[in-house]
Amino acid sequence: LLNGLLLPSAGKVTVNGMDTRARRHIREIRRLVAMVFQNPDNQLVSPVIEEEVAFGPENLNLPEDEIEHRVEKVLQIVGLSELRQMSPHMLSGGQKQRVAIAAALAMQPDYLVLDEPTSMLDQSGRQMILEYLQILNKQQGLTIILISHNMEDLTGADRLILLQEGSILCDAPPWEAFNRGEKHLDLKPPGIVLLAQMLRKRGYLLDKRITTLEQMENSICRLLRSTT
């Protein structure tokens, strides 16, 4: 819906004020909104990594030197510069995801939409992808919309929207959503949040906004300093 691949059956979807139903806006909307699918194999079409990353910018009819600059830049961002001559189909699942992200970033979008980007990855690959996304958001200023059933993927988000059959059940910062305790939300908080909740019940005055291990460490250190 966000990039006009599907049109809404009711209401309308706008991107930077542009209606996705207006054909005159589709080219610009698809430049602004980049997509990374759940299975990267479904969107990797080129035999070589650098060609895959260059595919989108080439369709924008950009000068060759600009395309090369973008390819080099995004491959550095995702840490795949040394593999640029390899086939993406020879890579691991995590590396394929990084190629798909690089191809999306080469379009210089304002918004990056990722559908279950960690569902096919092991723990180390999952952590690597999530760290890349944090860097892109915090350092590059890219707006990221991450769709996931795994609440562990969402602990670093600024905003969590819980949907059920097309309706919004919850729209809040992750820490607030995880601590509401509303059974109808059917929301299982991440392990670190459950641990913080358990410690608070035992009388430890930990910050309610804890959603990550780093935040837990900082909160415990502050607590220890205040009691010495």
PLM features per residue range, with description:
Residues 3:
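Helix-to-loop junction immediately C-terminal to a conserved catalytic motif
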Residues 112-115:
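Catalytic Walker B motif of ABC-type/P-loop ATPase nucleotide-binding domains
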Residues 87-91, 95:
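Conserved ABC ATPase signature
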Residues 167-192:
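Conserved beta-strand-loop-alpha-helix hinge in the C-terminal portion
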Residues 65-83:
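Conserved ABC ATPase "signature" region
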Residues 11-21, 29:
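Conserved ABC transporter NBD signature motif
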Residues 108:
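Conserved catalytic motifs of ABC-family nucleotide-binding domains
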